[in-house]
């Protein structure tokens, strides 16, 4: 009966709420929660262990200490339930009420709540429009504040020191009222009339000009409105009554030896009660003011410490010098309530153990130790034993299991059959870190794991442990089987490729089996079937590598599923024909008729999955694995010291390098090269020596000479074990073999600089002491980096999950026509990512036409699968507009069409899929593989960048220019006169093959649309200077060019040529400060020439340091350089790479020296210069007001006076800031920028992540906007709001014919975006808990529980996956209820009524016994 009651209570609790509201508690509300006032600081009586009356653990207030038993023992047993004992005043009920009953303390003097005071921005300060310092001075009794000025010259809220207060008293008597302490603040807050205040602020706002004041007013207005709408009263921020936490939540536990362990809260409460009681006594005694004040201040401090210890002043410490844990500390941080207990719970029916290999398991199985299974499945076993009649009671069943009688094992087998268990390995970085398997009982104590799932778990068998969880309910078992079974998780959610590819031993075995060798036993034999081959191999007539001819039978599966068989004879080897036995029907023999390296096996599995589906692939993967292990064993491949063959050429190469180094050293000593050059040269010499040695070594290792059938020598690929391991991709790489048999090479110091003497020895020769010592540097740095990297990567993942957790697919199609334009990614001469990889699995947003026609090739809303991608490639389409989550119109979610294919399943995504979390995991999981700090070991990268001075094409094709302005010079070549121009090479099908950026002043050797051949150089430029190109031909006229004032003449000693150098403003004499040196171009009659197509005279202004090679009155042609500006570039900017770069992008951090972009389209001119800055003016083409910007002088400008720029063009080079791109070029450009930049980092490490995942995060970064004009909406101009909210409001306004609000999208970093979510529960559990909760409470916010995190925290199914349907049903029911409220009312019965009825029944039952 009791359980039934519990059940009823529970039911009513979980179902009845749809949101959680947080607000301020009024004193009356606190009293209404309370079951009595706590008056004494005592806890329990140390002799009797009974709680003291009216103390912190009082049984009268909080409830009985033992179930159904009052304190004095007069009433015991269930039948007295609900009686209040007249002797001790304790209600007879369950002890559990001590966990929920609260008490209260009536404070003798009001106290400010520290959260609303000190949590910035201070809410009390904002409300009273006073500074925090002033309020603190009032609260802590340092000065008075005027409350009622009366008929005096004082103002309300004015601060008075002790002296000035006394003066005022003398002057005005009791005309006015001034107080100090929290009472004063309370009165000030009480005096605020919210409605009037709102009206006056709204009237005042438009007339304020100062930006800072307007911001402050808007903040204050928002706060007061929040108070007004939420029904909170400002004076509730001051506490008059302090609630007391139920005692079982701050327990006092007796330890052995008569001591007690207590929660810190008890100490904190004790201090408050002590001080409060002392203050009451002092007030009764009418003690002197100064004593009372001191006591009030101490009370305020003790309440501060209870609520949030350490926020103000020094933290109160306990006996052991550590700060006490206050209420705020209980909920925040990793160990706080949110993250420790609500988001991460420990679960029952779980166990953990070490893992070992289970090479004989099938893919869906795992080996579970019998001991563990017995413990995990106990309840099921008890049930079965009873059901079969082997045990009469549960107790008997328990005994049987403890004795481990034989029948128990039979029952266990029965229980386990078809009952999946879940295996998890920490850290669970992505969803493949938990998978379900069918258990197979094994002896021993270690869990056996299938080798193929190791990659997904990132598990190895060097002592890793794993946890087992048992899904109990039928639904849970069903979900585990259909969604989490390892066989259903073959593809990786990050990139859609198989994640169960074989590695290591399996690869080595398959590679060994598929190799061929010359003159193997049985070479040249012909077999009529694969059975015959096997017979010959087994009887020893043919060796596994022998080259033979075999007749094979292949099955072809047509589009419609028809199967046809075909036979043919192939040249192959014995091993390959044996491997083809495990090949499923429908795959071509050619897939195994090659050396099976890791790449080939991966491709084989992928092909199998795409052509034959899931089931066949799973079976095939298992068979491949068994075969691989078998042949690896047979091969006898091992690592021996003689396998590391040192090339003979090594010693001569090392000697040569040493000689070269000596030569450089001599040059340096005779002063021919600088120290830096010497260092770089030496490092280059050793690097190239290392390359040569390793090439010699690999050439040596990779082939061996054998005698063929005809008795002649022949070279064949080597069977050296080490070479085979590296070549197959099983383990090791050329770089590692180089260290074994070549030379170790150059080593880096811990700070990253390269030590110039390399280690010439290798591991086979062994290192000497100094070499070994140098080696240890790198090793230790590697370990330290890894540890830091793991922490950083984990934190990035956490932020990503938090920002994206509430993004779920919630509708089929939002109907948008927008999308992202996808083109192949081309960098220089390489296609980095072809179009098919970018659009595979996406939905077309706008019809794709056959090139050059109006005929539709792929209609809108087509999901592009592999077949469609082939079609696009065949028709050489190189641009498709696809749907993207960034442009999806769904509010609070996305639609299926904008997301496209679910990568882990290979079909279009389902509703309810939690794409946000999947995206965050996919980006965060490879984080540990990214390198910690900066990429690119400077050396290779730096030297290449400096030499870029031409474009050499790799493929033949046609030249095409992108956004390039150009003029033709006297030689008939094109000269580029625009920024950010690109030249591309197009093949005969119109597909772009290469694309290069070319700077201003590039001379093109080829005209547009001309044909080039591979290897031709098509563009040249000077990388070290920035030319100023003349766009007209004419005569040069110098303006403001005065020798010694604005310029100097310099003559080159070697060549004898003189040139003019413009002086920098700072170095000019006073006369030259205001002058603007420039070159004008005149025509033959001495008139100003105009720049073609405009009315602007051709006048070129020269910045400081410009070198002019022409003289006054010289003739000049179009496209010639008037002057050159030396570039102080190629200061190798440290390229941030790896994790920090990804984090910077997602946090949308501003780079140190951002590129300056043009805010408007128009014409450039320069205004008056200040000390360190230039004034840049942009005059719009329509003649509007010029926009001006101050730019530091040291920035290299890309533009000249009179040049036209488009909005968003780069004016000064630098790293582009994402915010600027969004503001000036729009949402699609910023999305492309972030996606490409993030992908660059991952691509460098060879990690594949689908663009979709990054787009999902970007959508979350863009979900806020800034209201520019409120229209008729309830928003304020300048307010930050959720885009979806604004859109919904605008739709309503438009429907009513009112003016909608206008807004600008805003890009927030992921941390900011997480904290700015609508759900305060989610934000509070992420970071800055105090600030989030304070803000939410003041605004009386209500959490609609829309995201996943909030629902986990309140203990519900999440609104995604299988919980999605449950939430949809609930919402439908709620909607129905809202529309048809009245009808149902009569029949329902509330839980409390049911409880009363049950109580009566129980009492009847109780009294009858």
UniProtKB/Swiss-Prot annotation:
Q: Which residues bind Zn(2+) 2?
A: 814, 888, 895, 898
Annotated catalysed reactions? RNA(n) + a ribonucleoside 5'-triphosphate = RNA(n+1) + diphosphate
EC numbers listed for it are: 2.7.7.6
- Cofactor: how bound: Binds 1 Mg(2+) ion per subunit.
Q: Which Pfam families match?
A: RNA_pol_Rpb1_1, RNA_pol_Rpb1_2, RNA_pol_Rpb1_3, RNA_pol_Rpb1_4, RNA_pol_Rpb1_5
Q: What SUPFAM superfamilies does this protein map onto?
A: beta and beta-prime subunits of DNA dependent RNA-polymerase
Which enzyme type, at the first EC level? transferase
- Tell me yes or no: is Metal-binding among this UniProt entry's keywords: yes
Quote the InterPro entries the UniProt record gives. Answer: DNA-dir_RpoC_beta_prime, DNA-dir_RpoC_beta_prime_bact, RNA_pol_asu, RNA_pol_N, RNA_pol_Rpb1_1, RNA_pol_Rpb1_3, RNA_pol_Rpb1_3_sf, RNA_pol_Rpb1_4
Which terms in the GO cellular component ontology are assigned? Answer: DNA-directed RNA polymerase complex
User: What are its GO biological-process terms?
Assistant: DNA-templated transcription
Q: Which residues bind Zn(2+) 1?
A: 70, 72, 85, 88
Q: Which UniProt keywords apply?
A: DNA-directed RNA polymerase, Magnesium, Metal-binding, Nucleotidyltransferase, Transcription, Transferase, Zinc
**What is its cofactor?**
Mg(2+); Zn(2+)
| Amino-acid positions noted as binding Mg(2+) in the UniProt annotation, renumbered to this chain | 460, 462, 464
Q: What does this protein do?
A: DNA-dependent RNA polymerase catalyzes the transcription of DNA into RNA using the four ribonucleoside triphosphates as substrates.
- Subunit composition and interactions: The RNAP catalytic core consists of 2 alpha, 1 beta, 1 beta' and 1 omega subunit. When a sigma factor is associated with the core the holoenzyme is formed, which can initiate transcription.
Stored NCBIfam families: rpoC_TIGR
Regarding protein family, the annotation reads: Belongs to the RNA polymerase beta' chain family.
* HAMAP family for this protein: RNApol_bact_RpoC
* UniProt name for this protein: DNA-directed RNA polymerase subunit beta'
Q: What is the lineage of its organism?
A: Bacteria, Pseudomonadati, Pseudomonadota, Gammaproteobacteria, Alteromonadales
């Amino acid at each position: 009966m009791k359980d039934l009651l519990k059940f009823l209570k529970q039911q009513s609790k979980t179902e009845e709420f749809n949101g959680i509201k947080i607000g301020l508690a009024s004193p009356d509300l606190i009293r209404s929660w309370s079951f009595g006032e706590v008056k004494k600081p005592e806890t329990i009586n140390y002799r009797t262990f009974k709680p003291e009356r009216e103390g912190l653990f009082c049984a009268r207030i909080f409830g009985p200490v033992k179930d159904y038993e009052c304190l004095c023992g007069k009433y015991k047993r269930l039948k007295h339930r609900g009686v209040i004992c007249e002797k001790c005043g304790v209600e007879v009920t369950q002890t559990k009420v001590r966990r929920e009953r609260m008490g209260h303390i009536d404070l003798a003097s009001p106290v400010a709540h520290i959260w609303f005071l000190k949590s910035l921005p201070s809410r009390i300060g904002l409300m009273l429009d006073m500074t925090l310092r002033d309020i603190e001075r009032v609260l802590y009794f340092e000065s008075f504040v005027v409350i009622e000025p009366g008929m005096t010259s004082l103002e309300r809220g004015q601060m008075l020191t002790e002296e000035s207060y006394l003066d005022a008293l003398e002057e005005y008597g009791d005309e006015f009222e001034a107080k100090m302490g929290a009472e004063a603040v309370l009165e000030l807050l009480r005096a605020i009339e919210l409605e009037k205040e709102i009206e006056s602020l709204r009237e005042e706002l438009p007339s304020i000009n100062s930006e800072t004041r307007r911001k402050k007013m808007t903040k204050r207005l928002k706060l007061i409105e929040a108070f007004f709408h939420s029904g909170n009263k400002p004076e509730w921020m001051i506490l008059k009554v302090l609630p007391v936490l139920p005692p079982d939540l701050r327990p006092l536990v007796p330890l052995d030896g008569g001591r007690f362990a207590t929660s810190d809260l008890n100490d904190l409460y004790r201090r408050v009660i002590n001080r409060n009681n002392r203050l009451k006594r002092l007030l009764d005694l009418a003690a002197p003011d100064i004593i009372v004040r001191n006591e009030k201040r101490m009370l305020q401090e003790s309440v501060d410490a209870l609520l949030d210890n350490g926020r103000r002043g020094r933290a109160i410490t306990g006996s052991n010098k550590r700060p006490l844990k206050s209420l705020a500390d209980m909920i925040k941080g990793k160990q706080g309530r949110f993250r420790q207990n609500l988001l991460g719970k420990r679960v029952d029916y779980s166990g953990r153990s070490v893992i070992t290999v289970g090479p004989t398991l099938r893919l869906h199985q795992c080996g579970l130790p019998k001991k563990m299974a017995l413990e995990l499945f106990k309840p099921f076993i008890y049930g079965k034993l009873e059901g079969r009649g082997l045990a009469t009671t549960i107790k008997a069943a328990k005994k049987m299991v403890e004795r481990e009688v034989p029948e128990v094992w039979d029952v266990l087998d029965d229980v386990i059959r078809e009952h999946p268990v879940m295996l998890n390995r920490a850290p669970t970085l992505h969803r493949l870190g938990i998978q379900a398997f069918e258990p197979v009982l094994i002896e021993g104590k270690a869990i056996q794991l299938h080798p193929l799932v190791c990659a997904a778990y990132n598990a190895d068998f060097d002592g890793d442990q794993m946890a087992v969880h048992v899904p109990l309910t039928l639904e849970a078992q069903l979900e585990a089987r259909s969604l989490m079974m390892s066989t259903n998780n073959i593809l990786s959610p990050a990139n859609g490729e198989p994640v169960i590819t074989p590695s290591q031993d399996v690869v080595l075995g398959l590679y060994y089996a598929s190799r061929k060798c010359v003159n193997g036993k049985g070479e040249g034999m012909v077999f009529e079937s694969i059975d015959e081959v096997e017979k010959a191999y087994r009887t020893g007539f043919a060796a596994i590598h022998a080259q033979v001819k075999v007749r094979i039978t292949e099955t072809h599966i047509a589009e419609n599923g028809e199967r046809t068989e075909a036979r043919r004879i192939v040249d192959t080897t014995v091993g390959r024909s044996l491997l083809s036995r495990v090949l499923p029907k429908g795959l071509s023999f050619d897939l195994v008729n090659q050396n099976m390296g890791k790449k080939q096996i991966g491709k084989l599995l992928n092909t199998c999955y795409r052509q034959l589906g899931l089931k066949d692939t799973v079976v095939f993967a298992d068979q491949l694995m068994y075969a691989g292990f078998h042949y690896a064993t047979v091969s006898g491949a091992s690592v021996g010291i003689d396998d590391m063959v040192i090339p003979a050429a090594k010693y001569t190469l090392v000697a040569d390098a040493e000689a070269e180094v000596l030569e450089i050293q001599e040059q340096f000593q005779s002063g021919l090269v600088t120290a830096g050059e010497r260092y770089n040269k030496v490092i280059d010499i050793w690097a190239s020596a290392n390359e040569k040695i390793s090439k010699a070594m690999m050439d040596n290792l990779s082939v061996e000479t054998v005698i063929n059938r005809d008795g002649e020598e022949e070279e064949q690929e080597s069977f050296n074990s080490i070479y085979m391991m590296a070549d197959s991709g099983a383990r090791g790489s050329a770089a590692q073999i180089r260290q074994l048999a070549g030379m170790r090479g150059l080593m880096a110091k811990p700070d990253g600089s390269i030590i110039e003497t390399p280690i010439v020895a290798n591991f086979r020769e062994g290192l000497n002491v100094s070499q070994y010592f140098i080696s240890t540097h790198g090793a230790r740095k590697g370990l330290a980096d890894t540890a830091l990297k793991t922490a950083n990567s984990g934190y990035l993942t956490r932020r990503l999950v938090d920002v994206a957790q509430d993004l779920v697919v919630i509708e089929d199609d939002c109907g948008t026509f927008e999308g992202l334009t996808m083109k192949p990614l081309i960098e220089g001469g390489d296609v980095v990512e072809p179009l098919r990889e970018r659009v595979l699995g996406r939905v077309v947003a706008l019809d794709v036409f056959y090139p050059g026609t109006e005929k539709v090739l792929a209609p809108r809303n087509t999901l592009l699968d592999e077949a469609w991608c082939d079609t696009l490639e065949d028709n050489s389409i190189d641009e498709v507009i696809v749907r993207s989550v960034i442009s999806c119109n769904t509010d609070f979610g996305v639609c299926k069409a904008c997301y496209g294919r679910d990568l882990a399943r290979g079909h279009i995504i389902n509703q309810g899929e939690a794409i946000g979390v999947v995206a965050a995991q996919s980006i965060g999981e490879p984080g540990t593989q990214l390198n910690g700090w900066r990429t690119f070991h400077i050396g290779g990268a730096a030297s290449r960048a400096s030499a870029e001075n031409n474009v050499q094409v790799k493929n033949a094709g046609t030249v095409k220019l992108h956004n390039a302005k150009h003029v033709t010079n006297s030689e008939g070549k094109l000269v580029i006169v625009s920024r950010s121009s690109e030249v591309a090479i197009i093949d005969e099908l119109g597909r772009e093959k290469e694309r290069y950026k070319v700077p201003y002043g590039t001379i093109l050797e080829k005209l547009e649309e001309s044909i080039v051949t591979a290897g031709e150089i098509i563009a040249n430029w000077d990388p070290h200077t920035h030319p100023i190109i003349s766009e007209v031909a004419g005569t040069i006229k110098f303006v403001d060019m005065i020798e010694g004032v604005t310029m100097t003449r310099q003559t080159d000693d070697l060549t004898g040529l003189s040139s003019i150098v413009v002086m920098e403003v700072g170095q000019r004499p006073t006369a030259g400060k205001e002058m603007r040196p420039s070159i004008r171009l005149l025509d033959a009659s001495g008139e100003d020439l105009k720049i073609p197509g405009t009315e602007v005279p051709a006048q070129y202004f020269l910045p400081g340091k410009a070198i002019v090679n022409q003289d006054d009155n010289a003739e000049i042609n179009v496209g010639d350089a008037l002057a050159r500006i030396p570039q102080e570039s190629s200061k190798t900017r440290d390229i941030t790479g790896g994790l920090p770069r990804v984090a910077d992008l997602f946090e949308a951090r501003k780079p140190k020296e951002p590129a300056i972009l043009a805010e408007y389209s128009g014409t450039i001119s320069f205004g008056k210069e200040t000390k360190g800055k230039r004034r840049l003016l942009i005059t719009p083409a329509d003649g509007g007001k010029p926009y001006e910007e101050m730019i530091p002088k040291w920035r290299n400008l890309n533009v000249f006076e009179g040049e036209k720029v488009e909005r968003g063009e780069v004016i000064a080079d630098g790293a582009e800031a994402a915010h600027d791109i969004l503001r000036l070029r729009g949402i699609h450009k910023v999305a492309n920028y972030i996606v490409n930049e993030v992908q660059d980092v991952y691509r460098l490490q060879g990690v594949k992540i689908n663009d979709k995942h990054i787009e999902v995060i970007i959508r979350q970064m863009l979900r806020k906007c800034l209201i520019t004009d409120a229209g008729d909406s309830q928003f304020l101009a300048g307010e930050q709001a959720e885009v979806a909210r604004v859109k919904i409001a605008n739709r309503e306004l438009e429907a009513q014919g009112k003016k909608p609000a206008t807004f600008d999208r805003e890009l927030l970093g992921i941390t900011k975006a997480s904290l700015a979510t609508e759900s305060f529960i989610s934000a509070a559990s992420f970071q800055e808990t105090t600030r989030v909760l304070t803000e939410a409470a003041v605004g009386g916010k209500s959490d609609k529980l829309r995201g996943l995190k909030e629902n986990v925290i309140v203990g519900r199914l999440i609104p995604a996956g299988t919980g999605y349907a449950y939430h949809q049903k609930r919402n439908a029911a709620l909607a129905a209820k809202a529309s048809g409220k009245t009808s149902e009312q009569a029949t329902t019965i509330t839980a409390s009524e049911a409880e009363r009825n049950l109580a009566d029944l129980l009492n009847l039952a109780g009294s009858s016994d």
